[in-house]
A protein has these predicted regions:
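Substrate-binding pocket helix/loop in short-chain dehydrogenase/reductase
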Residues: 102-104, 108-113
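Active-site helix of classical SDR
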Residues: 127, 163
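C-terminal helical subdomain
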Residues: 180, 187, 208-248
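Conserved glycine-rich cofactor-binding loop
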Residues: 12, 19-21
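Conserved glycine-rich Rossmann-like NAD(P)H-binding loop of the short-chain dehydrogenase/reductase
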Residues: 33-49
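Alpha-helical segment proximal to the catalytic Tyr-Lys
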Residues: 132, 176-177
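Residue(s) in the substrate-gating loop at a strand-loop-helix junction
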Residues: 147
């Protein structure tokens, strides 16, 4: 599916973590596909740059500085998006972080809390705040950006793995709860992508990751995100779509 086909023409997409990496790539791809894109992140300079790049190619975008660990900030994000574009059709829950890179025995509880606050509670806050707006549209899409580590775990990465496992379960529960409202909820697993988080796990080198894995650029994730966002109302829900070559 090519972005130039304008498959998302007129739709409004809110994307968290849109200032860099996968979130930024999806924001640019959705804009090229005709969506009005609301770029959310903690760092305003980064999402301002994303918006500038979208507008430079004739796209429509809005930057909203957001801290996904604060429910008030998340609520304001969706109020602002709706006031500006008239509603919300798509939510991409992408904001993520990893502050714990030690064994459970040696880990810092505060690092665990910070990781789960962003990856799991942040996802819950976004879904909780977005659902009323999606219902008003009569249908919608929620895409959670998960991780293979949430399905199989990773030594010295317990907090991140547990947060993504929780996100996958949240995805499945949301899909069941929102099925009557024609709101589909699916997980997108990018696999190994050259981003800050991936580099933390591999020390910046694919040699330290799975040798036969496909080491992607953020842009390589966009086609799958477009596919999920463009599915019909009766399309798949409660599913996990992965770009990994293997699951262990």
């Amino acid at each position: 599916m090519s972005a130039c086909e304008k498959t998302l023409a007129g739709r409004v997409a809110v994307i968290t973590g849109a200032g860099r990496g996968i979130g930024k790539a999806i924001a640019l791809g959705f804009a090229q596909a005709g969506a009005h894109v609301v770029c959310a992140a903690r760092t305003s300079a980064e999402i301002d740059q994303t918006v500038l790049e979208i507008e430079a190619t004739g796209g429509s975008a809005l930057a909203v500085q957001t801290d996904v660990t604060q429910i008030e900030s998340v609520s304001e994000l969706f109020k602002t998006a709706t006031a500006h574009f008239g509603g919300i059709d798509i939510l991409v829950i992408n904001a993520g972080a990893n502050y714990d890179r030690k064994t459970v025995e040696c880990s810092d509880p505060e690092d665990w809390k910070r990781t789960l606050d962003i990856n799991l509670f942040g996802a819950y806050y976004c879904a909780h705040a977005a659902i009323p707006y999606l219902k008003k549209r009569g249908a919608g899409k929620i895409i959670t950006v998960g991780s293979g580590l949430g399905h199989r775990g990773y030594p010295e990465g317990a907090a991140y793995s547990c947060s993504k496992a929780g996100l996958w379960m949240l995805t499945r529960i949301l899909a069941q709860e929102l099925l009557p409202y024609k709101i589909s909820v699916n997980e997108l697993i990018p696999g190994s992508v050259h981003t800050t988080i991936d580099d933390e796990f591999t020390n910046g080198s694919p040699v330290n990751s799975m040798s036969d894995e496909w080491h992607k650029q953020p842009e390589d994730v966009v086609p799958l995100a477009l596919f999920l966002a463009g599915q019909p109302e009766v399309g798949p829900t409660a599913q996990s779509f992965s770009l990994m070559r293997r699951d262990n």
